[in-house]
């Protein structure tokens, strides 16, 4: 077998018999195949949740494995870390080996036809540097390369296949980023496109600009206006009359329903007709805020029709795209989702009005917030009113809302949610529920991602194995060294290639084996999508100890903040169960949404009502998760609350903490972890003392006893220490295991 000197392309052929599909069709490509380069493979790995630097290294490793010994087909192992036999050596499939020989002949024929193809030098180079492999071999090699970099996933093989289908344009996804002006949609879409590997990013402003080239400003001033002051170009009387007619039509419909249900429907009809007649000639003019929303809706309706045609063309070509813009009103988006199953919408907003206002300073010509020189500041009331309207519509339709105060976490949350929705769509679920006119599936996935991020932010993940057991577990470690939660992990797969998870918890003698028992092995691992990736794992239901009071309060605060809207006082969970049936199935929105005067933006977005909205999305406000002991700690910071003995012990701890920060030795890491461990001394611990024995070791090697009444000065001191020396915890667990 001739060894390929350089591999630039990997042609992945569908099917097991590569001899039939390797035949060239005259265009220099193979039928039913896809050509992967290193950047394309790297983008595919990033789409399935790998970090960018890991995706770069894994793609390079895959090409090295494919290159070595003729795509590594006849090598004794695919992965040094697993010592796994080759698929062909393990099964002894002679026909598969014959297919590989035929595929290699295609590569060798390229060198024989050099003289015939001198007019196409690039085609010759491409054939010389191309290796043809089957889909199964390609997936196996990539999965083994992922295992070398300690990537563990619930269904990693299925995620890789799904990511390949998106990259090969066998499936597509359309991400919609809704939101008003100044909330960071353009920046978010650019970063998200880079993360997902989507090169088509379209703004609705560009669609509006294209439409303006076909009509003069005098002919259609509404189209030439900005969304936040488009209401100025509407006739208030005409708008009021139109809304009055719609209200009368709804009342007539309700009268007909009452007449059909009750025998006294005629009397009710007469009373309703008198009410309608009394307001027929006196339409009530709308407020300026309602006119701003009506102008926004009118311009959005013009843009959304052209966007509908574009999405139809993209879906026919299986092209993934990201669309962002203020014209993506949620009632219009629901109409689009009924026609286009590839849409995944998100609502981007800024809860803090001051931060929202600061974003407009960079858009002004003179970097100022002067309303005379900055039009965004001048119309900030209308912008906030439109955002309030969009947020309420998002709550009604259960569209996930992203408080875009931290761009990195916003991108990570959207990325993980989009891929989770693709998994469920691949399983046959519909993202849009036409009965309730909601997207509860997307909302559930987003909440799962937020819950997973909140859970995993309290510790670190390690792959553990109990002593005397062959079962591997994914464990979430608390900062004190105990296990908060575990998930089963196994390398076995079924006939379809999906992993088989073991759930046995009983030993041979019938005694239950504790999860928190003695450890035989513990090593850190990488999860797809980072902290958000644990949401895809099935819960094992086994924990070593109950969570601490602080952890419970943090989880409660985080969960409650996700279920409540930042723009509406009613819970989102209750709205999902009592959602009324959809009345209008067209792309146009319903008309009852602005019957009442929208509330002041200041009341909906005030800092007092939204203290749970932190600068970092997914984190919990520290002030809302403090236990009684922590408040006592803060109160004791004042010298008037300290006794002489406590003052002396506090100074001793302060000096020791400063010394630890300077030296940063391994023993100091254990002492700092011990300080945090003693904070939960009053809680019931079932973890063996051997697990944390190394944490009690000080510089001279002796065991040091601490009094529970000695408090730390600040919570942030221990957290920052662990953040700098996080590896010390893993060493402590390994030393604690017999």
Curated annotation (Swiss-Prot):
<feature type="compositionally biased region" description="Polar residues">
    <location>
        <begin position="270"/>
        <end position="283"/>
    </location>
</feature>
<protein>
    <recommendedName>
        <fullName>P-loop NTPase domain-containing protein LPA1 homolog 1</fullName>
    </recommendedName>
</protein>
<feature type="compositionally biased region" description="Basic and acidic residues">
    <location>
        <begin position="251"/>
        <end position="267"/>
    </location>
</feature>
<feature type="compositionally biased region" description="Basic and acidic residues">
    <location>
        <begin position="577"/>
        <end position="591"/>
    </location>
</feature>
<feature type="compositionally biased region" description="Basic and acidic residues">
    <location>
        <begin position="608"/>
        <end position="628"/>
    </location>
</feature>
<dbReference type="InterPro" id="IPR027417">
    <property type="entry name" value="P-loop_NTPase"/>
</dbReference>
<feature type="compositionally biased region" description="Low complexity">
    <location>
        <begin position="564"/>
        <end position="574"/>
    </location>
</feature>
<comment type="function">
    <text>Required for the accumulation of phytic acid in seeds. Phytic acid is the primary storage form of phosphorus in cereal grains and other plant seeds.</text>
</comment>
<feature type="compositionally biased region" description="Acidic residues">
    <location>
        <begin position="592"/>
        <end position="607"/>
    </location>
</feature>
<feature type="region of interest" description="Disordered">
    <location>
        <begin position="245"/>
        <end position="283"/>
    </location>
</feature>
<dbReference type="GO" id="GO:0010264">
    <property type="term" value="P:myo-inositol hexakisphosphate biosynthetic process"/>
</dbReference>
<feature type="region of interest" description="Disordered">
    <location>
        <begin position="564"/>
        <end position="646"/>
    </location>
</feature>
